[in-house]
Amino acid sequence: MAVDALGADVTALDGLADVGGVLLTASHQFPLGMPLHSDRRAAVIDWARRTGSVIIEDDYDGEFRYDRSPVGALHGVDPDHVVYMGTASKSLAPGLRLGWLVLPNRLVEPVVRQKGETEETSGFVEQLAMAEFIVSGSYDRHIRSMRAEYRRRREQLVAAVARSSPKTTVAGMPAGLHVMLEIAGDESALARRLAWRRLGVEGLDLYRHPDIGHERDGVVIGYAAPSTSAWSAALDALIRLLP
């Protein structure tokens, strides 16, 4: 599906035959950074109900919204047609391999069976520790602390770009652990210059579908990885190289 300022163009689903499901990141699209518009949320729910299809909702960055409360999940609107999917890979660490599914009742047994056939274990100790982390309230406190830190970093990045690179535009809403910068100039050349300075930045070309034209130049920048002590230097190095 094409993606525009309103998110994924779910109206395209009506023109496709034999589609049993669709994967959406309704809370925060990567890498462009917008949520799925309310009209399109309603449209995709209507499509799933009419066709008996399933929406797989990846709650991407749902816990990291900085300007307002997180957008409600599609699953809350229609739990019979939406599989809600989340993970602790960003809030804690990807190496924990902890994630969760909230399934329609009819899918619980086949999904559990299929998971057992393809994966022997999911780390029982890690699951028990995560359960205790959640029940004790520690996970919620951790999320609040991380949200405040990442909000601060994003605000510093946005302010620095506005101050030093007026031809560069910060795209997307205040959420997640990355920003997409629309730049004046060649994204590949900028990505190479940033890589030379050991800054892990990717051009939009990495994410474009081969059938989609080159509409704009941009780079995707994650701001969560640098340590607290390294953040200021990393930000300064980035800003010096922006066109």
Question: How does the language model describe each region?
Answer:
Residues 76-110, 122-125:
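Active-site PLP attachment segment
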Residues 112-116, 134-158:
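Structural signature of PLP-dependent enzymes
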Residues 148-158, 168-182, 187:
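Conserved glycine-rich beta-strand-loop-beta hairpin in the small C-terminal domain of fold type I
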Residues 212-243:
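PLP-dependent enzyme catalytic core of the Aspartate aminotransferase-like
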Residues 106-108, 128-145, 162-165:
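Amphipathic alpha-helix from the class-I
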Residues 195-220:
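Conserved PLP cofactor-binding pocket of PLP-dependent enzymes
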Residues 102, 180-182, 222-224:
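Short hydrophobic/aromatic beta-strand micro-patches
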Residues 10-18, 35-50, 54, 61-91:
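Active-site pre-lysine segment of PLP-dependent enzymes
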